[in-house]
């Protein structure tokens, strides 16, 4: 991306390129020449693509400078020239691929002396690799014209860069047909046989290792292409040649010819191990049931059914069988090695790389489950030799891992593939392992010896981990597996004393070790809540009572909240842009919220919240009871409830809005309206006019009958006055009569027509009646007569004339009836103004006379 979008800074190379006498070394001394080349600087490319400059750069990467030259000539210029030639610029690639003289100059590097400069060889391999990848046709055609190309490659195969060039030639050809042509050409040149000839005691170690690595790469590359299912017109000729028995026999002959050479043996075994690797299936047979299987330390994806059917190279197995005794002899008589002084003591003789690779080869041969090969290994007593090495080299875990794999493969090996008998045939490997190799006895003896050494303060044996896995393999295969019946019978045939020791070992030390190995690395228990923690320090915190109650209330709310709250809360993305249509959508959704109101819930948090609320409510009840006791009989029987025998009706409840309190006071909104009405007197009179005709019927519409007048004494100036109440609130408390009062009922008429809350005059009795609040229930005339019976008949001497509003509060306590309904509350407790005196009749009428609209 840096080069693609031209994010580099401006360079002064353009100014430098304008010089007429500019030389190539002077240009290569610039630090940003490579960056300018990658961004395809036209002036720079024109300068570099000159034939003389291209030949100079090719000479720098192919010709070794004199040792006495400057450091820039020896290292800097060849390195910068190689980077420019391999910068993957199309113009440079085209110039190199089209100029055969430049290719000949490059090819001449292989025709130099016996040894190549490793640094120049890496430059040469890198340039040839970019040409193979970008100019495949031109370069392959050029190389096939050279008869000595394969000879030159094999001559310098000891140089790692040349081995990389051979691998690039095999892997960088993308077109299948051209790649197959390259493989056939190399097979015709007998490159496989000639690489095997390099694995010979007469060659040096570098040639051994590089030739072996090249053969292994050819095997893996060819098999990988088969797995990927790449269609090719012909089978891979190089792989077919490598898997032939004659080719393997040639390799084995070179390994054991003449004096033993560890490098030759190890390099040859690496090729054999690669050939014995199980073949992975083609991509079309791989399913979702694939699982990971470790083969020679590498993870390979194998189908479970194809793993057992995967056969190793039969040519390698047939060629390996006659040489098994030579490999077994290497285990018994290894090449001479000097003793090694280890931290735990002297190791004489060391195991060595040779015997370690031999153990790997024999383990792969046993895992192949070939009947003839297995029989030969049992005759040579190879399993017993492997166990001897296992217990002898205590701290060689490479050896322990290979022997463990070998023993596990032998215990779980099925019948030979070529066995045609329907009846199960005893597996000779399992019998040899338990009876001849005394596997169970060795496991018990080694375990007891380790316990004895550790009890004395000595170190633990290095093979104990692998020994545990071997013992588990015996137990598991005895319970289930292809040889479970045979293995169980062999365990029963052990001596009685050894059988008891084995059973005690399996149920005791082995079970304890397995339990320790399966315990989580972090020994903690997962806590579901803080109350599950057993740490006493976390239970000593004392939280304030308010915090506990607040948390309990929050828990109570969250537990009663259903999932509908989350689903219906907030705005929908689609409706958010539609402001006019969806303005009420959140309110509609909020109306659908449901909460659980189960009264039978026994949640401790809910109980705690209920107790708290009861305590606080009880405090208010106690205060109200004290106030009621202080007033005594200051309230009349009809102040706050229905008279006995009447139906209580809250007349004002249906007419008043939620904001109006029971005492006639309103919320802040109505207070604002009150201020507006005081400023505008006309609006106030209009409101009263709408109420008067319906609330106070005219005398002509009322039937004649006896009446009574209530009069009040003048209130002293120091008497407490009630709270101011708006005129609109007083008028709103007057109810519309539904029917005229009955004949003969006492009538109330207003002594002060200017205010509806003025005290009323009783016409047939002198008992003073307290004005009722708007929230009082309606009563019948009969109830009024029964209540007023026994009261004083003389009228009060109260002045019924119009009084000053500031002092027109009657003395209720002096004229109230001592009879007060039990359980009812006084107006003071409810915050009711005591200046309202509109007594509501059962039918909603007021006993007073009509009030005209102009009387306000």
Swiss-Prot record:
Keywords: Cytoplasm, Phosphoprotein
Function: Regulatory subunit of protein phosphatase 6 (PP6). May function as a scaffolding PP6 subunit. Involved in the PP6-mediated dephosphorylation of NFKBIE opposing its degradation in response to TNF-alpha.
Ranges where the record places region Interaction with PPP6C: 10-403
Family per similarity comment: Belongs to the SAPS family.
SUPFAM superfamilies: ARM repeat
PANTHER family, sorted: SERINE_THREONINE-PROTEIN PHOSPHATASE 6 REGULATORY SUBUNIT 1, SIT4 YEAST -ASSOCIATING PROTEIN-RELATED
Protein name as annotated: Serine/threonine-protein phosphatase 6 regulatory subunit 1
A molecular function (GO) term: small GTPase binding
Subcellular location: Cytoplasm
Comp. bias intervals (Acidic residues): 621-630, 667-683
One cellular-component annotation, GO: cytosol
Subunit structure: Protein phosphatase 6 (PP6) holoenzyme is proposed to be a heterotrimeric complex formed of the catalytic subunit, a SAPS domain-containing subunit (PP6R) and an ankyrin repeat-domain containing regulatory subunit (ARS). Interacts with PPP6C and NFKBIE. Interacts with ANKRD28, ANKRD44 and ANKRD52.
InterPro entries: ARM-type_fold, SAPS
Residue numbers carrying Phosphothreonine: 524
Species of origin: Mus musculus
Organs and tissues of expression: Ubiquitous with highest expression in lung, spleen and bladder.
Disordered: annotated segments: 621-770, 792-856
Low complexity compositional bias, start-end: 842-856
